[in-house]
């Protein structure tokens, strides 16, 4: 079902080359490297039957990529990477370069092993940002991502090292805040795996359109302290 869902959209759109990112992690959709390899093998076989060339990037799915979870918050991360902002999420930048590099190699634009550097050059010299702006203009123009009227931090209850993030519960938290139905709603992460955490410091900030959604999200966070595992 997953293979049909993913590939049918690509085939219907008329794609000839497809690069797919497969995040692997205990709370990701794909939990082991073996499962990722099996999925990519089956998907490759189906894709080849339709004349579709594929490549797979197996990535770390132990934690969310970037800081924002929710349409506008994720868009802010993307824009920060494209314009080269000093505080742009480095993990999102690296993931984007890996995938873009794979696209360049699969399409024959770059020799194998050189796609990453070609993608990095296009990002660093502004060509990627210029192309993104052109794509937006072709679809009606650039728009500033909306901001939610209500925000509230959720703080760590103890000090220590962040050792685990439950991706499924993080996703649930963002949905309770209103994402993705409310484009500005969601959460912003303030910590990454391996970070030192101080009790009382914010782990996430919840963004919501309505007081009820904000309350639902914060109540869920309070009832699920294992969203973030912190070891002393």
Put a short name on every predicted segment.
Residues 1-232:
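Well-ordered secondary-structure scaffolds
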């Amino acid at each position: 079902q997953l293979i049909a869902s993913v590939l049918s959209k690509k085939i219907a759109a008329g794609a000839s080359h497809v690069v797919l990112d497969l995040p692997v992690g205990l709370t990701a959709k794909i939990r082991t490297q073996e499962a990722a390899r099996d999925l990519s093998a089956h998907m490759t076989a189906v894709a080849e039957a339709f004349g579709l060339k594929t490549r797979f990037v197996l990535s770390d799915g132990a934690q969310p990529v970037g800081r924002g979870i929710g349409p506008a918050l994720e868009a802010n991360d993307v824009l920060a990477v494209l314009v080269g902002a000093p505080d742009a999420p480095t993990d999102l930048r690296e993931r984007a370069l890996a995938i873009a590099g794979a696209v360049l190699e699969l399409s024959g634009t770059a020799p194998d092993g050189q796609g990453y550097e070609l993608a990095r050059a296009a990002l660093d010299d502004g060509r990627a940002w210029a192309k993104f702006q052109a794509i937006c203009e072709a679809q009606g123009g650039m728009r500033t991502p909306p901001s939610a009227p209500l925000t509230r931090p959720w703080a760590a209850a103890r000090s220590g090292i962040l050792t685990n993030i439950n991706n499924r519960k993080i996703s649930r938290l963002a949905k309770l805040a209103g994402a993705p139905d409310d484009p500005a709603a969601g959460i912003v992460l303030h910590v990454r795996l391996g970070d030192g955490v101080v009790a009382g410091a914010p782990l996430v900030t919840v963004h919501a359109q309505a007081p009820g959604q904000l309350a639902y999200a914060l109540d869920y966070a309070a009832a699920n302290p294992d969203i973030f595992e912190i070891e002393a």
